[in-house]
Amino acid sequence: MLKVEKISVAASGDIVAVRHAVRRQAVKINLSLVDQTKIVTAASELARNMLIYGGGGEVTLEVLQEGVRHGLRVHFVDDGPGIPNIDLALRDGFTTGNGMGLGLGGAKRLVNEFNLESAPGKGTRVTITRWK
């Protein structure tokens, strides 16, 4: 496992930086165009949620190698208010804002591995992985 890049997310322009960084690393490990699009879309949704609901935070990208298998793991960490009901938040249609409620559940479906840890007042940590 190699830490590749850290990006602070504090403004909407930082979401674009996350998208570009994820795409760049996905290309480097030769993910298919479809898999590149999936992880970039998931990362964009999660960075957007982190900014809107968590007040911003930090994104870390890691290139993974396990034997002959390569992957890209992206961590999202914020110190926001946390998510009181994770199961409810992962349901399609759930939103606490003006969005369509597809962010967390949609992001989960786009990646091979998805982990979410959160508690009220403790912030949120989401980790996604896409394998080649």
Where are these regions (language model features)?
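Bergerat-fold GHKL ATPase/HATPase_c domain
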Residues: 1-41
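Hydrophobic alpha-helical segments and their boundary regions
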Residues: 19, 32, 43, 71, ...
